[in-house]
Amino acid sequence: MTKFIFVTGGVVSSLGKGIAAASIAAILESRGLNVTMLKLDPYINVDPGTMSPFQHGEVFVTDDGAETDLDLGHYERFIDSTMTRRNSFSTGQVYENVIAKERRGDYLGGTVQVIPHITDEIKRRIHEGAAGYDVAIVEIGGTVGDIESLPFLEAIRQMRSQLGRNNTLFAHLSYVPYIAAAGEIKTKPTQHTVKEMLSIGLQPDILICRMDRKMPADERRKIALFCNVEERAIVGSYDVDSIYECPEMLHDQGIDNIITEQLQLNVQQADLTAWKKIVHAVKNPKHTVKIAMVGKYVDLTESYKSLIEALKHAGIHTETDVQITFVDSESIEKNKGDVSVLKDMDAILVPGGFGSRGVEGKIAAVRYARENNVPYLGICLGMQIALIEYARDVAGLKGANSTEFDLKCAAPVVALIDEWQTADGSVETRDESADLGGTMRLGAQEVELKAGSLAVKIYGSGHIRERHRHRYEVNNNYVSALEQAGLVIGGVSAGRERLVETIELPNHPWFFACQFHPEFTSNPRKGHPLFTAFVKAALNNKKA
């Protein structure tokens, strides 16, 4: 029978529930358990796919093509399980399914209500996502006390009642602030958030206290007394230099022993050797490189969370401190293409994105990298930008652009394809009037690499599988002209469309761009060959 750990948060949002939950999962996995994780989001959007990065941060894409919360990225980076669409759902999805059932007549004319119909749907989805695993860690988004979270909290209350204390555990993350003016740690916010939980029938079994320092014994005893939680189950989650220190930090306070005792799990002791090696590599780099990330969401770096982590992973595997400088592509555009900010950089990366804002600034960055032999990595839009720049400045295609930015451009080298074959062989279609939600090329796709290409050298294989999230493609009508001008198409989709997947420049020290998102499959234990190769290229450029 699957055991459930429910992780909730109180006082304020953005405390790091996802990291805490993933760290617990990593510890339990090291004890030999088969662990999965679920994220329940209270917003009414069906998924975050159409939400602004400024509102939501990164949209993480699963292997089967679900657009999900960035916390699923943390889950995959911390444990070996691969997330799917079953590992994430929102209020919007729950209501959508319940309403569809009502329209079909599944409820036999009954009145459809939050309890039991919505809560039953939530429980069904939790059980569905957890099926086949020893332990399922379920993170409830939002903050306890919010109206939006109430159906989810009621659902997990019912699960405790139905499954019992030995099959369910509540871990609540709370903020314990230090008031500098008074020189005191304040426990009152934690007392109040636990009071809020108790009012809806939830008693925390573990309290994880988010702090900027280690918790003194007096405060631990005080919280235990007033919150009716065992003193040993008051666990500090304090600021650390790297999130990959968190599993060891929580393990050192015995959190996994509390969990295994309550859930009656007879398992081996934790072995965090791999995590200790990762932390040692993070803290003891032998080299340093400066990489410019040129994008338009630089004011909210959470928009590039997986990308930032993938570069850090490459740093771990090359013993390198990867220092990222975020460059606003709009500022380059406004300064008439001035790229002087890039002159001290060892490499340049243009990430994915949507819309025309800042595009010309990104094109200027690509031009600088190409003309000055600076290692360049383009991802998704970053590949399309590189291709547009090459088409204009090398191939001589006047008016080259993407129809995303200029529907009537003279040379649409990037355009919206209206039909393509999915991984399962089915055919999907779309046009300019199609809904934005769920109409992209999403999830893992097969890619065939060209023999002798840089792509094959990087991956060590002629066939790879990478995740995608995009709506526009390289226009195959222009591929021949671009190849004649010296551009190498290093990879194409395995389907009948033969869509361009990677491009490279043969006479450049290291210039590579891909249509897919390799950052979604990088983790600190293994890294990813593309990012490792990119950081090595940056190191070589620095030495040169």
UniProtKB/Swiss-Prot annotation:
Region called Amidoligase domain, residue ranges: 1-265
Domain Glutamine amidotransferase type-1: 290-544
Catalytic center residues: C380 (nucleophile), H517, E519
GO biological process, one term: 'de novo' CTP biosynthetic process
GO CC annotation, single: cytosol
Residues that hold UTP according to the record: S13, K186, T187, K188, P189, T190, Q191, K222
SUPFAM superfamilies: Class I glutamine amidotransferase-like, P-loop containing nucleoside triphosphate hydrolases
Binding site for Mg(2+): D71, E139
One MF term in the entry's GO annotations: CTP synthase activity
InterPro entries assigned to the protein according to its UniProt record, in alphabetical order: Class_I_gatase-like (IPR029062), CTP_synthase (IPR004468), CTP_synthase_N (IPR017456), GATASE (IPR017926), GATase1_CTP_Synthase (IPR033828), P-loop_NTPase (IPR027417)
Binding site for CTP: S13, D146, I147, E148, K186, T187, K188, P189, T190, Q191, K222
Pfam family, one: GATase
Pathway: Pyrimidine metabolism; CTP biosynthesis via de novo pathway; CTP from UDP: step 2/2
Positions bound to L-glutamine: G353, L381, G382, M383, Q384, E404, R471
UniProt keyword annotations, A-Z: ATP-binding, Glutamine amidotransferase, Ligase, Magnesium, Metal-binding, Nucleotide-binding, Pyrimidine biosynthesis
Recorded catalytic activity of this chain's protein: UTP + L-glutamine + ATP + H2O = CTP + L-glutamate + ADP + phosphate + 2 H(+); L-glutamine + H2O = L-glutamate + NH4(+); UTP + NH4(+) + ATP = CTP + ADP + phosphate + 2 H(+)
Activity regulation as described: Allosterically activated by GTP, when glutamine is the substrate; GTP has no effect on the reaction when ammonia is the substrate. The allosteric effector GTP functions by stabilizing the protein conformation that binds the tetrahedral intermediate(s) formed during glutamine hydrolysis. Inhibited by the product CTP, via allosteric rather than competitive inhibition.
Binding site for ATP: S14, L15, G16, K17, G18, I19, D71
Additional free-text comment from the UniProt record: CTPSs have evolved a hybrid strategy for distinguishing between UTP and CTP. The overlapping regions of the product feedback inhibitory and substrate sites recognize a common feature in both compounds, the triphosphate moiety. To differentiate isosteric substrate and product pyrimidine rings, an additional pocket far from the expected kinase/ligase catalytic site, specifically recognizes the cytosine and ribose portions of the product inhibitor.
Function: Catalyzes the ATP-dependent amination of UTP to CTP with either L-glutamine or ammonia as the source of nitrogen. Regulates intracellular CTP levels through interactions with the four ribonucleotide triphosphates.
UniProt subunit comment: Homotetramer.
HAMAP family from the UniProt entry: PyrG
Family: Belongs to the CTP synthase family.
Protein name as annotated: CTP synthase
